[in-house]
């Protein structure tokens, strides 16, 4: 059953990506469409063995959206998520730190644009903790078993955080996709 849900998610986001791509051909200056496209790419990246390329593509689409509408809070938040995800996937500490810093900057801008968003504020808090999570925390107990336990907890926490970021991205992308599919009322 879980595999069926995964396949359905894959199909939904692949469809959203194709729709956004077709819409882009008609109107390349639609910031909302670019944001939906990037959200779909971020979700699809979860199904890739090498997700970094798809995340970079999402970052480019979000960059385009922000050139069109620099105050688009959901695009600011999504690009922050993309950088956060990219940082966690990076084995190079400098590259990871750079991406965590960019994520923090974009989350801060999203908070400034929509200060009432608890999700944006929590994302900003998470981004500030990302470097420590990425390195596995600071040196702690001298006992090997205690150290192993701490690493396991840190690793589990890292995956929990990454899961919540992905879930939040999924919710935003789904809402954006649903909003784009609502019929226009005629008056």
From Swiss-Prot:
Query: What is the reported tissue distribution?
Result: Expressed in roots, flowers, young cotyledons and leaves.
The organism is: Arabidopsis thaliana
Q: Show where the record puts the motif AKR2A-binding sequence (ABS) required for mitochondrion outer membrane targeting.
A: 179-187
Q: Which UniProt keywords apply?
A: Acetylation, Membrane, Mitochondrion, Mitochondrion outer membrane, Protein transport, TPR repeat, Transmembrane, Transmembrane helix, Transport
Upregulation details from the record are: Up-regulated after antimycin A or rotenone treatments.
* Keyword presence, Acyltransferase: no
Q: Which protein, by its recorded name, is this?
A: Mitochondrial import receptor subunit TOM20-4
Q: What happens when the gene is disrupted?
A: No visible phenotype. Triple mutants tom20-2-tom20-3-tom20-4 are vible but display a slightly delayed flowering time.
The biological process GO terms on file are:
protein insertion into mitochondrial outer membrane; protein targeting to mitochondrion
Which gene name does the record give?
A: TOM20-4
Q: Which PANTHER family match?
A: MITOCHONDRIAL IMPORT RECEPTOR SUBUNIT TOM20-1-RELATED
Q: Which InterPro entries match?
A: TOM20_imprt_rcpt (IPR010547), TPR-like_helical_dom_sf (IPR011990)
Q: How does it assemble?
A: Forms part of the preprotein translocase complex of the outer mitochondrial membrane (TOM complex) which consists of at least 6 different proteins (TOM5, TOM6, TOM7, TOM20, TOM22/TOM9 and TOM40). Interacts with a variety of mitochondrial precursor proteins. Interacts with AKR2A. Component of a mitochondrial large protein complex that contains, at least, MIC60, DGS1, TOM40, TOM20 proteins, and petC/RISP.
Concerning PTM, the database record says: The N-terminus is blocked.
GO MF annotation list: protein-transporting ATPase activity
One GO cellular component this record assigns the protein to is: TIM23 mitochondrial import inner membrane translocase complex
Location within or outside the cell: Mitochondrion outer membrane
């Amino acid at each position: 059953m879980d595999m069926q849900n995964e396949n359905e998610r894959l199909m939904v986001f692949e469809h959203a990506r194709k729709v956004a791509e077709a819409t882009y051909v008609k109107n390349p200056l639609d910031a909302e469409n670019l944001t939906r496209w990037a959200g779909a790419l971020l979700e699809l990246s979860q199904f890739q063995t090498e997700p970094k390329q798809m995340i970079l593509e999402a970052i480019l689409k979000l960059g385009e959206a922000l050139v069109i509408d620099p105050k688009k809070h959901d695009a600011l938040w999504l690009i922050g998520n993309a950088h956060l995800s990219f940082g966690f996937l990076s084995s190079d500490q400098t590259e990871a730190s750079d991406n965590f810093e960019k994520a923090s900057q974009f989350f801060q801008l999203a908070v400034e644009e929509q200060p009432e968003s608890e999700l944006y504020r929590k994302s900003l808090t998470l981004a500030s903790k990302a470097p420590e999570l990425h390195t596995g925390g600071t040196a702690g107990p001298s006992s090997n078993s205690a150290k192993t336990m701490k690493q396991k907890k840190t690793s589990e926490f890292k995956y929990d955080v990454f899961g919540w970021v992905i879930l939040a991205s999924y919710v935003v992308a789904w809402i954006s996709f649903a909003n784009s599919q609502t019929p226009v009322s005629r008056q």
